[in-house]
């Protein structure tokens, strides 16, 4: 079952390399995955569910990679480390994920389907960095990091260097602007 779901997710990501998200049909994804359509529809009703599951898979991989990494006492360093691990995991899917982000701009309904998944990822990153997200200051930290994450991902899409040097520099600057805030209110 898990293998089939990953196959379907990867099929969608492969199609996204050359096709706009809104033009992709479920039967095309299922055909690419080479699974029987009856079996496939047991897993996913629509392509939005596939995307959500894909991003949950990325979250799980990120969480597993961080098990062996000892977090420092510096919040900024932790956020930087976790973010860059996520970027490394997403790297093979960069063009496809960019296509999804571009589609969100033009398809508000897609945003409505994916926003919970996005905020779940932000919450996970903050939790992994031991940043409290309790009300009221916690919500502010949450929103600030969501903006940093989203804007840095946008920069990453335009960073074609092998080691994501430009992205790392931008992330470091943006986290640096809020470093004191994250530490003081934690």
Q: What do these predicted regions represent?
A:
Residues 3-12, 29, 54-58, 62:
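Generic hydrophobic, amphipathic alpha-helix propensity
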Residues 15-53:
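Helix-turn-helix
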Residues 28, 81, 99, 140-148, ...:
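Amphipathic alpha-helical interaction segments
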Residues 53, 67-95, 99:
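Hydrophobic alpha-helical connector segments
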Residues 54, 58, 62, 82, ...:
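Hydrophobic/aromatic residues within well-ordered alpha-helical segments
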Residues 108-131, 139-150, 179:
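Amphipathic alpha-helical packing segments from all-alpha helical-bundle domains
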Residues 127, 158-186:
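C-terminal peripheral helix-coil segments that are non-catalytic and often amphipathic
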Residues 150-153, 157:
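Short, amphipathic alpha-helical segments that act as regulatory/interfacial helices
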């Amino acid at each position: 079952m898990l293998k089939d779901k990953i196959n379907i997710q990867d099929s969608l990501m492969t199609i996204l390399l050359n096709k706009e998200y809104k033009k992709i049909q479920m039967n095309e994804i299922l055909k690419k995955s080479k699974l029987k359509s009856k079996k496939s529809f047991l897993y996913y009703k629509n392509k939005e569910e596939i995307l959500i599951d894909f991003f949950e898979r990325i979250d799980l991989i990120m969480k597993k990679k961080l098990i062996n990494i000892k977090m420092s006492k510096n919040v900024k360093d932790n956020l930087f480390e976790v973010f860059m691990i996520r970027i490394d995991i997403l790297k093979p899917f960069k063009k496809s994920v960019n296509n999804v982000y571009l589609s969100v701009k033009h398809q508000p309904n897609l945003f409505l389907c994916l926003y919970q998944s996005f905020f779940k990822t932000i919450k996970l990153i903050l939790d992994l960095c031991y940043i409290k997200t309790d009300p009221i200051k916690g919500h502010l930290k949450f929103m600030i990091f969501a903006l940093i994450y989203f804007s840095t991902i946008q920069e990453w899409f335009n960073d074609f260097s092998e080691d994501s040097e430009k992205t790392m520099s931008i992330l470091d600057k943006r986290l640096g602007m809020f470093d004191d805030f994250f530490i003081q209110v934690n």
